């Protein structure tokens, strides 16, 4: 069965931080959006989050016809998905909830509409088990803020058709994203596994009194993080090998991998460690509100994305290379 690849109506189930980010991105790309969330006050909270994201999206550039009023909020799953060309679920990370939700979504949706889940920790073969037409079901795992960060990890389950993966890649690309196909179902996918390793080491460094939360963030944002934003890890290390490249780098620094630097297992989250992390991040935040920091984050991300795009174009590269 061919799947819908060019969409006009986007369904969003779940309207928290991730779900609202999807809604804002879809609206900014000129789509009609139908949203559903059973939580009390969900519609008002969703519209406020979209309004908060809109200034950054305006700076980035809106598609023709993009408007916040193209968001509809409905009271049932069936109303949300039955006319949708693409469906994105962003419900809480509970297997029982997602099993029930996707059985209802797939029963009411068009049979050729791709169904995606924003899950970061559950595997698609598990929670799409009760879905009808599971061949069109994928994971589409985004990163916060969804309306600005382009990466989306696409993961198929045991029943997912290759054509569904390709359809999802095309749809996300039309939404201005950089789809990354995760070839195997593994917990945490790709990006979160890398982030989790860094998070574990950071917690150990705080726990052992080596550094404060602010010092660890400085080590990233004034060092490796700057290179990571446009080169990633492997290309950075290729350059570290000089003219001889990655082979020389691995021969020279490979033995260091066996040194007992890494802690690997996570530290126990004692009250003392939690207090140190909370107090440290509170000091970093200072008197600024979360809303102020979100605006700072969005403006800075826009500047970084623009700078990367400009520099890549200068060197004959596209943004997604």
Swiss-Prot record:
Q: Is-annotated flag, keyword Acetylation?
A: no
Q: Which GO terms describe its molecular function?
A: carnitine 3-dehydrogenase activity; NAD binding; NAD+ binding
Q: In which pathway does it act?
A: Amine and polyamine metabolism; carnitine metabolism
Q: Which UniProt keywords apply?
A: Cytoplasm, NAD, Oxidoreductase
Q: Does the keyword Cytoplasm apply?
A: yes
Residue numbers spanned by region Important for catalytic activity: 317-321
Modulation of this protein's activity: The enzyme activity is strongly inhibited by Ag(+), Ni(+), Hg(+), and p-chloromercuribenzoate, and partially inhibited by Li(+), Ca(2+), Mn(2+), Co(2+), Cu(2+), and Zn(2+).
The residues listed in the UniProt record as binding NAD(+), with positions renumbered to this chain, are 14-19
Assigned EC number: 1.1.1.108
Catalysis: reaction(s): carnitine + NAD(+) = 3-dehydrocarnitine + NADH + H(+)
Q: Which GO terms describe its cellular component?
A: cytoplasm
pH influence on activity: Optimum pH is 9.5 for the oxidation reaction and 6.5 for the reduction reaction.
| GO biological process terms held by the UniProt record | carnitine catabolic process; fatty acid metabolic process
As for subcellular location, the record says: Cytoplasm
EC class: oxidoreductase
Tell me which HAMAP family the record gives: L_carnitine_dehydrog (MF_02129)
Complex and partners: Homodimer.
Return the similarity comment. Belongs to the 3-hydroxyacyl-CoA dehydrogenase family. L-carnitine dehydrogenase subfamily.
Q: What does this protein do?
A: Catalyzes the NAD(+)-dependent oxidation of L-carnitine to 3-dehydrocarnitine. Is specific for L-carnitine and NAD(+) as substrates since D-carnitine, other carnitine analogs such as choline and betaine, and NADP(+) are not substrates. Despite a high similarity to 3-hydroxyacyl-CoA dehydrogenases, cannot dehydrogenate 3-hydroxybutylate and 3-hydroxybutyl-CoA. Is probably involved in a L-carnitine degradation pathway that allows Pseudomonas sp. strain NBRC 13558 to grow on L-carnitine as the sole source of carbon and nitrogen.
Name the chain's protein: L-carnitine dehydrogenase
């Amino acid at each position: 069965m061919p799947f819908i690849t060019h969409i006009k109506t986007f369904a969003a189930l779940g309207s928290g931080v991730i779900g609202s980010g999807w809604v804002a991105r879809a609206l900014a790309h000129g789509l009609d959006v139908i949203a559903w969330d059973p939580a009390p006050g969900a519609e008002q909270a969703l519209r406020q989050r979209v309004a908060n994201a809109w200034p950054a999206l305006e700076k980035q550039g809106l598609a023709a016809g993009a408007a916040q009023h193209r968001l509809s909020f409905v009271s049932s799953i069936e109303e949300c998905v039955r006319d949708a060309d693409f469906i994105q679920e962003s419900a809480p990370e509970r297997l029982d909830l997602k099993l029930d939700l996707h059985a209802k979504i797939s029963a009411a949706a068009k049979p050729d509409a791709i169904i995606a889940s924003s899950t970061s920790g559950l595997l698609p073969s598990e929670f799409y088990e009760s879905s009808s037409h599971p061949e069109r079901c994928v994971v589409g795992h985004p990163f916060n803020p969804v309306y600005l960060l382009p990466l989306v990890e696409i993961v198929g389950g045991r029943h997912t058709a290759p054509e569904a993966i390709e359809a999802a890649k095309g749809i996300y690309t039309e939404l201005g994203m950089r789809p990354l196909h995760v070839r195997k179902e593994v917990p945490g996918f790709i990006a979160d596994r890398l982030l989790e390793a860094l998070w574990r080491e950071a917690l150990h460094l705080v726990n052992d009194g080596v550094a404060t939360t602010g010092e660890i963030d400085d080590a990233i944002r004034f060092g490796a993080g700057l290179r990571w934003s446009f080169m990633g890890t492997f290309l950075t290390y290729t350059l570290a090998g000089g003219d001889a490249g990655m082979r020389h780098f691995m021969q020279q620094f490979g033995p260091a991998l066996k040194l007992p630097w890494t802690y690997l297992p996570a530290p126990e989250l004692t009250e003392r460690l939690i207090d140190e992390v909370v107090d440290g991040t509170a000091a970093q935040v200072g008197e600024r509100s979360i809303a102020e920091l979100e605006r700072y984050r969005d403006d800075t991300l826009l500047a970084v994305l623009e700078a990367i795009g400009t520099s890549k174009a200068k060197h004959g590269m596209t943004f997604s290379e």
